[in-house]
Amino acid sequence: MGIRYLLVLVLVLLVLGCEVQGAHMPQQDEATTSSLFTQMQESFYGYWGIAKSAAQGLYEKTYLTTMDEKIREIYNKSTAAVSTYAGIFTDQLLSMLKGDQ
């Protein structure tokens, strides 16, 4: 289960990293005939678009709302516990610093 999320994370980061670099704008060649390089380049960008849409579909398919709710619940419980223990620690520290008066 962890490997699947790691794979999704890597794919999403790869897509985001490539999107940050900017969209590819094909340049107008002076020659009317396309060379082998431009054909390979167009083919690569076509495959890249398919892979990008597949990664996005995989991410949307694996996004679980129940997992999101569980994470929010755990966060709320942990912050409540931390604030409670921080209050207890502060009270103990103040009573130690004040001493018996």
Curated annotation (Swiss-Prot):
Gene Ontology, cellular component aspect: chylomicron; high-density lipoprotein particle; low-density lipoprotein particle; very-low-density lipoprotein particle
Q: Does this entry carry the keyword Methyltransferase?
A: no
Q: Which GO terms describe its molecular function?
A: phospholipase activator activity; phospholipase binding
Q: Which domain of life is it from?
A: Eukaryota
Which keywords are on file for this protein? Chylomicron, Glycoprotein, HDL, LDL, Lipid degradation, Lipid metabolism, Lipid transport, Lipoprotein, Secreted, Sialic acid, Signal, Transport, VLDL
Region annotation (Lipid binding) maps to: 66-74
Signal sequence extent: 1-22
Principal place of residence? secreted
Spell out the subcellular localization from the entry: Secreted
- Residue ranges of region Lipoprotein lipase cofactor? 78-101
InterPro entries reported for this sequence? Apo-CII, ApoC-II_dom_sf
Q: Which residues form a coiled coil?
A: none
GO terms of biological process kind: lipid catabolic process; lipid transport; positive regulation of phospholipid catabolic process
Q: Name one Pfam family in it.
A: Apo-CII
Q: How does it get modified post-translation? A: Proapolipoprotein C-II is synthesized as a sialic acid containing glycoprotein which is subsequently desialylated prior to its proteolytic processing.
Task: Name the protein family.
Answer: Belongs to the apolipoprotein C2 family.
Q: Give the matching PANTHER family.
A: APOLIPOPROTEIN C-II
Report the protein's function: Component of chylomicrons, very low-density lipoproteins (VLDL), low-density lipoproteins (LDL), and high-density lipoproteins (HDL) in plasma. Plays an important role in lipoprotein metabolism as an activator of lipoprotein lipase. Both proapolipoprotein C-II and apolipoprotein C-II can activate lipoprotein lipase.
Q: What is this protein called?
A: Apolipoprotein C-II
Please tell me the species this chain comes from. Answer: Leptonychotes weddellii
